[in-house]
Structures are given as structure tokens and as C-alpha cells.
Curated annotation (Swiss-Prot):
Heterohexamer; disulfide linked. Contains 2 sets of 3 non-identical chains (alpha, beta and gamma). The 2 heterotrimers are in head to head conformation with the N-termini in a small central domain. Disulfide bonds: none annotated. A long coiled coil structure formed by 3 polypeptide chains connects the central nodule to the C-terminal domains (distal nodules). The long C-terminal ends of the alpha chains fold back, contributing a fourth strand to the coiled coil structure. Cleaved by the protease thrombin to yield monomers which, together with fibrinogen beta (FGB) and fibrinogen gamma (FGG), polymerize to form an insoluble fibrin matrix. Fibrin has a major function in hemostasis as one of the primary components of blood clots. In addition, functions during the early stages of wound repair to stabilize the lesion and guide cell migration during re-epithelialization. Was originally thought to be essential for platelet aggregation, based on in vitro studies using anticoagulated blood. It comes from Antilocapra americana (Pronghorn). It is found in: Secreted. This is Fibrinogen alpha chain. One of its GO terms (cellular component) is extracellular region. The gene is FGA. One of its GO terms (biological process) is innate immune response. Conversion of fibrinogen to fibrin is triggered by thrombin, which cleaves fibrinopeptides A and B from alpha and beta chains, and thus exposes the N-terminal polymerization sites responsible for the formation of the soft clot. The soft clot is converted into the hard clot by factor XIIIA which catalyzes the epsilon-(gamma-glutamyl)lysine cross-linking between gamma chains (stronger) and between alpha chains (weaker) of different monomers.
Length: 19
């Protein structure tokens, strides 16, 4: 996932809710 919000199912703060 790509983004800046900790949303999307991943635990990293670099994940986005897009994926």
C-alpha cells in the first residue's frame, strides 16, 4: 500500500488505505 496514513491493513505508518 502507498500513502501516508496508517490505514490499509498494514502496520507501517507509510501505508495508505488505497490498497
Amino acid at each position: 500500500a502507498d500513502g501516508s496514513d496508517p490505514v490499509g491493513g498494514e502496520s507501517l505508518p507509510d501505508t495508505g488505505g488505497a490498497r
